[in-house]
């Protein structure tokens, strides 16, 4: 709520100074508005993404929400914050973004590493995936910081790569994270539990469930031939051109992500079968129908990324 209030106040004062809500006119006049307006809009988006340290609402909200709501929050709502950076901050406040790009990248890096650290400590699968989401979406904001540095026109390739990477990462993570939360919801519905250490050997009991869970997790890990790989490769290519040190540091987040996600797979699906869950039902036909489009899109965007990059390039050209 506070983030929405800050953003609303920022928009109201932006109108007061410019006399318009038209994006084209704002792109011309936004360079000269009060820094407080930029800070208000930035604060609202900071909460919505979210970025550390304004992320404290996310884990309790995601953990307490019903599965469909959590899927909506991670698949759509968090991406609206990133969309706000691309659609509002980048075109309307380019000078302010350029001035504060380093700070934005620093907080994005902090969120990447802090999100991974928090995920490593979780045993509740829903909270673990929440902090994984915090970690992954921060890569998008890292790319936004790169756009600010590249906005002087000297890094045109970096600007295009980072923008396309951000768009593809929103798409890829939205699919994988929503699918994983759906599967954890099914697990909780079948067993009444969602602890990482409550299970074991489920791959032998529910092979279809395990196969889909592995695919979605590997997409989150950024394995080749999946959408997550193409997205992260583009973001890192764009950020490395303007901030190589920060980019190298951000790869530590990838290593930590591999640790907590692979540990999750090992604890839940491998080892001896828990006798309590030997009769646990596998995915039903309807559940497979829900998950199949997600899997198809993940591999499509990973194997044929040009299909999506041609589309996102048109969007990229609309952003100054």
Which role does the model predict for each range below?
Residues 68-69, 102, 126, 163-164, ...:
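Residues that define the loop-to-transmembrane-helix transition and helix capping
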Residues 49-63, 113-132, 185-188:
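C-terminal ends of transmembrane helices
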